[in-house]
Structure formats: structure tokens, C-alpha cells
Amino acid sequence: MPAYRSRTTTHGRNMAGARGLWRATGVKNSDFGKPIIAIVNSFTQFVPGHVHLKDLGQMVAREVEAAGGIAKEFNTIAVDDGIAMGHDGMLYSLPSRELIADSVEYMVNAHCADAMVCISNCDKITPGMLMAAMRLNIPAIFVSGGPMEAGKVTLGDGRKVSLDLVDAMVAAADDKISDADLAAIEEAACPTCGSCSGMFTANSMNCLSEALGLSLPGNGSTLATHAFRKNLFLEAGRRIVEVTRRHYEQDDASVLPRAIASKAAFLNAMSLDIAMGGSTNTVLHLLAIAQEGGVDFTMDDIDALSRKVPCLCKVAPNTANVHMEDVHRAGGIMAILGELDRAGLIDRDCPTVHAPTIGAAIDQWDIARSNDPQARELFLAAPGGVPTQVAFSQATLWPDLDLDREHGVIRSAKAPFSKDGGLAVLKGNVALDGCIVKTAGVDESILVFSGRAKVYESQDAAVSGILTGKVEAGDVVVIRYEGPKGGPGMQEMLYPTSYLKSKGLGKACALITDGRFSGGTSGLSIGHVSPEAAAGGTIGLVRDGDRIEIDIPNRSIRLAVPEDELAARRAEQDAKGWKPAQPRQRQVSAALKVYAQFAASADKGAVRILPE
């Protein structure tokens, strides 16, 4: 029987001082011996996805206490990728994931907490906390802040459209859009608290937490503003005490993160990711989370799944006017998992924090097969249409559910958006260890593409080239030395891809990089090229005018340069050192240098690898 970790600090004569300090936080004599549950919050006023979380940690704490536990809250940092985008602030985004994981470990281990409820939401916070959960392997339940409502605007020509943050970015660089329309788009794009409303990285990761079995049904899609989301927080507080007691008092290891998020659960999550056309960043994060838990989940697994899992759901940025609120109306993540289950693409036996197996959860919560009144009510939660930063502030309901699996937001495997899934792994001489493309966002006309390289040594240089007309139809924009080591920090490339769209080149150009992309990216955008340029990858040998051949159906990417020429270039580059040809005006802090020193390549999740 495992001993409660917290008794290290609450029991024994030698812990009199520690008990005195616990009492100073509000713990009473009668509380000693109860499980101590860490409420791992991430409230900040910098991030719309987290601005409403301030009081939610204490809401969970009260439920923990009512269920017989001691609740103690702390906060992690949270970087807003949208605000950090397009300048050197983006260098800090991915490294913040490791800092979040470390800070959770530090707090939980320093104070010997028995379990935790993780309140996350945006891009690096959910994966950072998931990494910590796998690392610590104590009972954990995730509940995120929820998606933002989509913006609604009427343009000058009378068109009414749903939109999001990325629409504002694209519109800003489109000379055809009037100042008045741009102002209207900007003001309407982000109307409420919550994670940005498309299937971007934040929402993708919160959806995947459902498939991993570590969060409750509806976590990925119930709007931040809706009253129904409150139930997820209350249930998390109650349930964490139950599963904690099962582990420590009944010796039940099946409730631990590593037992729940097994290899099979990661395959389920990746199948969901491919089916819903999630952000390419999810690949990076799932690899990192798996590594923390010692799970043998690799790019080869992702490649194999991408060849058999169809695309069953298309959401912004992969299609216009469809956002997370629409996915929710169609049954949310449990509905997509249900369609994958019907196609034999889900392992039903994986346990979860809320049901004995994911199969049992699907049977209850998939509205296409279940008449469970709780499920059918949950997925009627609709946007309120009122700008707000207050959680649970509206209770609007859809008039009906979207159960159309032939033409609706969620499709069956018999009527998919495409037989090929929404993500693919490409390999070839320019990416020997692989790279990632979000096929759900690629137009069918350019699934096979060949073009001349236009090489840039930084994201800033590429943006300048695109905006000044130096990039033309038929070009393959190459942005290098932006990987985990080379950036450092592996910046997102949302501005270059958005500007290609605004210049009318979204279907006429490709972009490849050893950096990564925002979840808001679409188009022929190929990221995570591994090995990266700074690690001696072939992408560092590409020269202007070289032909690059991309064949997504055959999963290949090739630099059409003879091997002897590449060998000569490599010898020349070895002599010079693997660094940008033109010096960059970039201030790299000591903190970023530490990350770069230990960062692995993208195919390993860009985690830190310590020397043995």
C-alpha cells in the first residue's frame, strides 16, 4: 500500500515546524491525515484563455475540501502565443513549456502533494502540465478554461461571417480589405475569454486530453463562457479526492497518469488529432509528453496512423465559418472518437479518470449512439454572443444537435472530408528524421508541388521578403535556423503563412522550416524539419533556386540536388560552422541559451536531453 506523500510533512515529531507552517495556511488539527491536493492553476491577465481562471482554482478547492481533502493552490506562468507572435517574444513560447513542467514538479515535490487538479488552457500550458503529470505520476485530473466564442461581424458588403484571431492577422496584410472592414474584424475577432476559437494548438491539446483519458467529457469543446462548463470544475474537485483515495488506500495504480496515458492511449489521441486536423504543434507536444512518461511513442507511430485514419472534422483554420462551438454542437470530442470507434480505429480498453474505459465513455457520451440525457444536454451549450471576460456567464442553448454525419461538422468514416487524415509525416533527403504538414489545411491542387527555393535565415527576413514582393508563385519559401537550437526556441511561423495568403499566394507557394507553425496556420506549410539546420540538417544546405519536390500522398519531400553536390556543400558548411549565413539582430538571453544547450530536435518533441 503506497503511503500518502503528504505525510512526510504532516506526521511525526520531527515535522512539528512543518505542521506549524501548514496551520498558518489554514490547515486545522482535524485536517492532518487528509490527502493534500495541489490545485495547479495558470491564471494571468496577459492571456484571454486564462484571464477568467482567477476564482476557478478556489472553486475547485472548495469541492476538494467538501469531499474530504486539503486543497492548496498555486499558479504557473502562461505565455500568449498570439501576443508573442511576430517578434522575439516568440523565442520564449516553446521553452516556457519546459519551465511550466519544471515549476509544477518543483511545487508538488517540494510540498509533497498527493495529487493534483491541473487548470490549464492555452498553447504551452496544457502540454507543460501534462508533461509534469507524466513525470510525477501521481493522481491528476485536467480541466481547462475552455474555448472562446467565435467572433461575428457584418462586413461593408453586407456579408455576415464567423471569424477568429487568424482572420484578423490575414486581413491586416490584405490591401483589398478596407480600413473600416479591418477595424470591424479586429474588434470582433476575439469577443470573450477562452482559448482562440478555432482548432488551434490550445483547443487541439485540450481535446487530446479527453482522448488520453485525463480530462472529463466536454473539456475540449464546452465554451469558456457557458454555465455548463462550471460542472467540469466541480466534478474535477470531487473526483480527484476519490481517485486519490483509490490509489493510496486501495493500492490502485490504474488511476495514475502513466497507467491511463499508455501507448494505446497515445495512439487513440493521435488518431483523434489526425481525424480532426489538429495543430501540428500537437505532434511536438505528444512526443514530449510520452517521453516524460517513458512511453514508446514515435514519429513512426504517427506516420502509420496518418496512412489509415481519415479526416472526419474540419474546423478553422482548415475551413471557414466553423469553430469549436460548432464542433461542440455536433457532440464534441466524444462524437469524433465515436466515429473512429465505429471504424475500428480506437482501442476501447484504455482507462480514464472518469470511466472504467474510453469505450464505456464513448458509449455514454457519443450523442450519435447514446440517449443519455446528461450528454444530450451538455452538447446543446451554445455561444451567448455577448463580449465578456467572465466564465460561466451565459446559458444559451442550440435549438438542436448536429447529428448529420454525412454533411455535418463531424463526419462518419464512410463519408469523410478526405480518406487521408489531417496530418502527415514526410521524409526525404531534406528531412531525414521527418517533418510535419497539416494536410487538412492544404488545397488538393497542391498536394503534389515542385518549386524553386527562396531561402531565408530567419522568420523576420522571410516576412520582409513576402511583404516586399520578393516571393512569387511557384516558390518554396525556406526558413531555417529557427529550430529548437537554432532559434533558439523554435518560433511559430504564423505571420509568414498568413502573409502568403493575404498576397494571394496561399495556393501558389510552399513553405518549409525547421521551426514550427501556429495552430492557426493552413496552406502547404511544412514544419519541424529534422534534423534542424543548427544540428547539421540538410535544410541548412539549400540554396536559392534549388528545386524542392513535395509529394504528400507519397509522404516524401526531396531536395533535387545531386548527392555529390550536397556532400561538397556539407563539407563547406562544416568548415564554416552551422549558423546563419547573414548575422541576425537577435538578442538571445541566458535563459534561452540554457534551453538551446539541451534541446533535442523536433522529431523528439524538442524536449531537453541531458548528457549522460
Swiss-Prot record:
GO terms for molecular function: 2 iron, 2 sulfur cluster binding; dihydroxy-acid dehydratase activity; magnesium ion binding. Mg(2+) binds at residues 81, 123-124, 492. Its EC number is 4.2.1.9. It is an enzyme of class 4 (lyase). The keyword Transferase does not apply. The active site is at 518 (proton acceptor). It catalyses: (2R)-2,3-dihydroxy-3-methylbutanoate = 3-methyl-2-oxobutanoate + H2O; (2R,3R)-2,3-dihydroxy-3-methylpentanoate = (S)-3-methyl-2-oxopentanoate + H2O. The modification N6-carboxylysine is found at residue 124. GO terms for biological process: isoleucine biosynthetic process; L-valine biosynthetic process. The keyword Iron-sulfur applies. Pathway: Amino-acid biosynthesis; L-isoleucine biosynthesis; L-isoleucine from 2-oxobutanoate: step 3/4; Amino-acid biosynthesis; L-valine biosynthesis; L-valine from pyruvate: step 3/4. Keywords: 2Fe-2S, Amino-acid biosynthesis, Branched-chain amino acid biosynthesis, Iron, Iron-sulfur, Lyase, Magnesium, Metal-binding. HAMAP family: IlvD. Belongs to the IlvD/Edd family. NCBIfam families: ilvD (TIGR00110), PRK12448.1 (NF009103). This is Dihydroxy-acid dehydratase. It comes from Paracoccus denitrificans (strain Pd 1222).
